[in-house]
Design a protein with these regions (language model features):
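Active-site loop-to-helix "anion-binding N-cap" substructures in soluble metabolic enzymes
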Residues: 1-320
Length: 320
């Protein structure tokens, strides 16, 4: 992985891929937390200071959950405010308008192209069902149209690094590629964790993106890095099913609709091979009449989804 530090950027056209995917207000669609946008500012400043012109490609929301799927005009406005520098938004990713604008970019100019998730080639179902490798992705419309316009590609999207999509894996096949300072920093920190630099090591894996959790679980169990793995969220649900716990038809249907039941077999293997290292929820919180109610796992109603781990689980995890 090559660092951007010291690279001659004078007069170069740079394709920057950050992760500025942000939570939005459900009604107004205003950005309610711009932390990821703020973290992108240093690499943009570095590129501008070096004399480059910058085109940004990024995503907002996901086709598995359309609530946060919007254009990037408000992201452009935020970046402009933090930089105190003009940032243009163009509602096109790789069509004629985008190509024409990128060709005309001058040093010091910044343009944010349209939401990548509006492209079929970048959506989750395409990534999951088609399963192309990096070389094949170079033949996508997005990469064929954009790659010839740039001198180099900078990846600053560590939080999206698990994605097998053209914007994440294909441009480095065709362009000189560098890691932005944030990606480089986070990569080094993760490398230390994965290689057991600090002991004891406890991993807390939860949330809805269980591909991330299971992607990390396998190596840290196999190489002995993890002393304990505490599961919650959807990851915890899958583990409970693998352990033979009846979590109800509604939960199973939810996991099936999200195409997540495939992780159950992996979970069974991990529980068999590492029974003392993996902890699962012993109680959960559900909603009853608009109120939070905590119940043991074996008492969980079969027609509801759990919202959170319960106090008993929290207490058990604190003891680790």
């Amino acid at each position: 992985m090559l660092s951007l530090e010291g690279v001659d950027l004078r007069g170069k056209k740079v394709l920057l891929r950050p992760d500025i995917n942000s939570p939005l207000d459900p009604q107004s669609k205003e950005i309610v937390n711009d932390e990821r946008i703020v973290k992108t500012i240093p690499v943009i400043q570095m590129l501008l200071k070096g004399g480059a012109s910058v085109a940004i490609i990024a995503h907002q929301g996901d086709t598995l959950d359309y609530q946060n799927l919007t254009d990037l005009s408000k992201h452009a406005q935020k970046i402009s405010e933090y930089l105190d520098h003009p940032v243009e938004y163009l509602d096109d990713v790789c069509g004629p308008a985008a190509v024409q604008r990128v060709k005309a970019l001058k040093p010091g100019e910044i343009v944010i192209l349209g939401n990548l998730r509006y492209l079929t080639e970048e959506v989750s179902t395409f990534e999951r069902d088609v399963k192309l490798d990096a070389a094949a992705y170079t033949k996508t419309w997005e990469v064929r149209n954009l790659a010839p316009l740039f001198d180099l590609y900078v990846n600053e999207a560590f939080s999206a690094a698990h994605r097998n999509s053209p914007s994440m894996v294909a441009f480095q096949e065709l362009l000189p590629t560098y890691a932005g300072p944030l990606l480089f920093q986070e990569y080094e920190a993760l490398s230390k964790i994965l290689h057991g630099a600090q002991k004891p090591a406890v991993f807390v894996l939860g949330g809805a993106k269980i591909s991330d959790a299971f992607g990390m679980m396998k190596p840290v169990l196999e190489n002995g890095t993890a002393d304990k793995i505490l599961t919650s969220g959807v990851t915890g649900l899958v583990m409970l099913i693998a352990a033979g716990i009846n979590v109800g038809e509604k939960t199973v249907r939810f996991l099936k609709d999200k195409d997540l039941l495939g992780f159950v077999e992996d979970s069974k293997e991990y529980l068999k091979n590492y029974p003392d290292k993996i902890m699962m929820p012993v109680d959960v919180a559900i909603e009853e009449n608009g109120k939070r109610v905590e119940i043991d796992i074996d008492e969980m109603p079969k027609d509801t989804l759990y919202l959170d781990i319960g106090a008993k689980t929290v207490a058990a995890y604190r003891e680790v």
